């Protein structure tokens, strides 16, 4: 009997800033997700400060500290295995795509920028 596995991806808001003293806002969406194993997952962040140049995605497993998953400078795409980070500076929008989701992907994902 084969059971369908689910991957729980929890998204949190994270605000990081090291660029002068201007007000900066970062917002993540969607909220908590449950997706079938093997699906493609899209996690998104929007930001308000066009001065941001460094874009990071962190993964944090339960009861562990966050670990750097992807790092991108300026704009464009960066791919690492099943993970792709995409930055669109003109829209102030970044995304993380996870292909072929696995149970081991169950974690909290955080976007950060500076």
Curated annotation (Swiss-Prot):
Glycans are attached at residue 44. GO terms for cellular component: T cell receptor complex. GO terms for biological process: adaptive immune response. Its main location: membrane. Keywords: Adaptive immunity, Cell membrane, Disulfide bond, Glycoprotein, Immunity, Immunoglobulin domain, Membrane, Receptor, Signal, T cell receptor. InterPro entries: Ig-like_dom, Ig-like_dom_sf, Ig-like_fold, Ig_V-set, TCR_variable_domain. SMART domains: IGv (SM00406). Residues 1-21 form the signal peptide. Residues 24-114 form the Ig-like domain. Alpha-beta TR is a heterodimer composed of an alpha and beta chain; disulfide-linked. The alpha-beta TR is associated with the transmembrane signaling CD3 coreceptor proteins to form the TR-CD3 (TcR or TCR). The assembly of alpha-beta TR heterodimers with CD3 occurs in the endoplasmic reticulum where a single alpha-beta TR heterodimer associates with one CD3D-CD3E heterodimer, one CD3G-CD3E heterodimer and one CD247 homodimer forming a stable octameric structure. CD3D-CD3E and CD3G-CD3E heterodimers preferentially associate with TR alpha and TR beta chains, respectively. This is T cell receptor alpha variable 12-3. It comes from Homo sapiens (Human). The gene is TRAV12-3.
């Amino acid at each position: 009997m084969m059971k369908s596995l689910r991957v729980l991806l929890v998204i949190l808001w994270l605000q990081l800033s090291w660029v002068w003293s201007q007000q900066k806002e970062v917002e993540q969406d969607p909220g908590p997700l449950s997706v079938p194993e093997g699906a493609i997952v899209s996690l998104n962040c929007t930001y308000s400060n066009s001065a941001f140049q460094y874009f990071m995605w962190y993964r944090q497993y339960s009861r562990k500290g966050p670990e750097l998953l992807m790092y991108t400078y300026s704009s464009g795409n960066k791919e690492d295995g099943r993970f792709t980070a995409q930055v669109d500076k003109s829209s102030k929008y970044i995304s993380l795509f996870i292909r072929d989701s696995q149970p081991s992907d169950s974690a909290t994902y955080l976007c950060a920028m500076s």
